Every structure is written in C-alpha cells, then in structure tokens.
Amino acid sequence: AWAIAKENCVHADNAGGYSCLVEIESMEGETTRYLFDTGWNYDWMDTCFKREGIDNMLANGEIAGFIQTHEHMDHYWAFPVVAKYAPNIHIYTPNTFYPEGKDYIKAAGHVGEWTEVKKGLYPLQPGVALYQFECPIIFRVFGEMSLYCNVKDVGLVSITGCCHQGIILFADTAYKELKYEKDKFYGLYGGLHISPFDDWDPKYDDLVIGLKKWNLERVGCNHCTGLITAQKFVDAGYPVVKGTARFRSKTTNYLGNGDVIKFPA
C-alpha cells in the first residue's frame, strides 16, 4: 500500500506527521495501550517505532487498539507500518472515511476487527471515550475523532490529533456532554491546529485567550499547533510541558519524537 502512496506523493520523503502512544492505567492498576495515528512516511515511522519499541509492542499484542483520528496523509499514510507488525490489531476510524481511505487499510494487509465510530461519544473503556466530530476538513476529508479520559482525583484529560473541529469546540463539547472528576478540565495534549503554517492572524489571539477559562494544569502541544502558537501559550503563562527537541523538533515548546507527558505529573 505504501508503494502506491509513494508513487502518488509529491514529496514522498516527507517525515512530517503525527503519532503517539497512549497508555492508560485503570482503577485496578492494569495498563492499556492505544496507538493514536501513525504519521506520514513509511521509512521514518518504521524507524521511530523501532527506536521507541512500538514495533515489538505491536507484534506482541501489547497495544489494544489503533485509533485513526482522521484521513489526512500526515496522520494516516504510514498505516502499512502498523499492519506490518500487527495485521490483526483492532482499529477505530470515523465512519466518514471515503472508499479510497478504507481501501488503503485493506491494501495495507489489515485483517483484524474494525470499528467505524459514528458522530458523538463512543466509550472505549471505563473513564475513556472517543468522540467523533463531523466537520469538513481541507483536502476533501470529513470527520475527526479525539479522546477524552477521566482521571481519578484529577479531572479530564483530552487528546487530539489535529483538532480540526476547533480547540474551543473541543473543550466546550467535553464540558457540555461529559461528567468528570472535580468538574475540572485538567490536561490537554496534541496538535491544536491554531496556526499550523505560522501565518499568524490577530484573530488567533482570541483562541489563545479563550483557553484561560479552563484553568488547565498541563498542556502538551506539537504538530499543527504552530510554533508561534506554542510560544504564545508560554508567554501567556500556560503550563506548557516542554520537550527535548532531540529528534529534529524546532523548539522545546513542542513535545517531539520520543518525548513523554504524564497526567497527572
């Protein structure tokens, strides 16, 4: 499948993209892992998975499910790497995928269970749920999923791939539709899609200011958030968890390759 994608790419060697491993500890002390998106370039993601041990986790069945947040190339085209190590893994996608996107999963060699998540809330396990936002996105993509986690004695932690639905809607949806510890929005992680190309518009300042009402205690950002946005978060006094920038990230304001964020700290 990657050979087809590579042939049709303008820049097939682009190593940009987004993928993260989510580890959730239950009330009984058991850890469940989900792989959240899978990046863009096959070779780069295979290298990263090997470096971080994701390849062995996939092969050994230590990752319970693969969550594909949306159909964009920088989150999805390296899926053949996932299928290479875990062709039977349970995958979750929005039910808005186009036929071509669905064919890519099959062409990659996936033969496991496949859940197509409808609009709204989809419980994954106690205290953890996906939410599918039906929103139009650039490049003929429609629909994106995010993850909400209710952390005991702490509050809500939200994880997003690109947040094309908008960061304010992302936060407001949780507040209106979910119940969580202390009625507290504790943490946020992922690509926040405010100014991904750093073409800052003064109206984006309203989005930065708008986050203040949630009194977040831990924020981790990267990918499409935008370098200017990340710096504005820092300047505004938000509790941004810094990365190491040891694998080509342009700033420590981003959590990059191999970096870790924990909720609570």
What does each model-found stretch correspond to?
Residues 1-13, 129-138, 191-200:
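Glycine-rich phosphate-binding "P-loop"
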Residues 1-52, 144-160:
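Conserved beta-strand hairpin/beta-sheet module of binuclear metal-dependent hydrolase folds
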Residues 18, 73, 78, 89-98, ...:
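Pepsin/retropepsin-fold aspartyl endopeptidases
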Residues 31-34, 64-65, 88-90, 156-157, ...:
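Short active-site oxyanion
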Residues 43-92, 178-189:
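Active-site metal-binding motif and surrounding structural segment of the metallo-beta-lactamase
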Residues 63, 74, 91-105, 183-186, ...:
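Membrane metalloprotein/metal-transporter helix-bundle signature
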Residues 71, 146-157, 162-252:
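Cap/insert and terminal regions of metallo-dependent hydrolase folds
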Residues 93-145, 232, 242-264:
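Metallo-beta-lactamase
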